[in-house]
Amino acid sequence: MHCPFCRHPDSRVVDSRETDEGQAIRRRRSCPECGRRFTTVETAVLAVVKRSGVSEPFSREKVIRGVRRACQGRDVDDDALNVLAQKVEDAVRGLGTPEIPSHEVGLAILGPLRELDEVAYLRFASVYRSFSSAEDFEREIEALRAHRGA
């Protein structure tokens, strides 16, 4: 790694620690040329493969934006959305693959969203699962009632 101060092409790792609940590694480095220290953070890139085949990095912000639309007019605060996005990221990282289909991200959103707000869940599920009739909504509401009773 190049030193950000003198651009020397090498550096020595002084200390390494896990951070962000094990999702990243923070390294303290020292430049052998100028002697200055700097910090780097390394994370494994999780790629989402869209239906078109295009791959893009996983984005918590994108998850939050999509869920926020479903929560419009509901009493759901930003902290709850951030927690939901973290749960979704943990779930998709837990699959253990570097690339995940966008469909799997949608599935990972449904569970935590159902626990957060049932109306927002129905809104999100209706778009995600392409509801086309009132019967689709009725089936999903029955499934919600069964889940609540379990």
Swiss-Prot record:
Q: Name one GO biological process term.
A: negative regulation of DNA-templated transcription
Cofactor notes: Binds 1 zinc ion.
Functionally, this protein is described as follows: Negatively regulates transcription of bacterial ribonucleotide reductase nrd genes and operons by binding to NrdR-boxes.
* Gene name, Swiss-Prot/TrEMBL: nrdR
The UniProt family comment states: Belongs to the NrdR family.
Query: Any idea what this protein is called?
Result: Transcriptional repressor NrdR
Q: Which residues form a coiled coil?
A: none
Q: Where are the zinc-finger regions (unnamed) in this chain? A: 3-34
Kindly list the GO molecular function terms attached to this UniProt entry.
ATP binding; DNA binding; zinc ion binding
Among PANTHER family, the record links this protein to: TRANSCRIPTIONAL REPRESSOR NRDR
Q: Which organism is it from?
A: Mycolicibacterium smegmatis (strain ATCC 700084 / mc(2)155)
Asked if the Swiss-Prot or TrEMBL record annotates the protein with the keyword Zinc-finger, the reply is: yes
**Domain spans labelled ATP-cone:** 46-136
**Which PROSITE patterns does the entry mention?**
ATP_CONE
Task: List the cofactors.
Answer: Zn(2+)
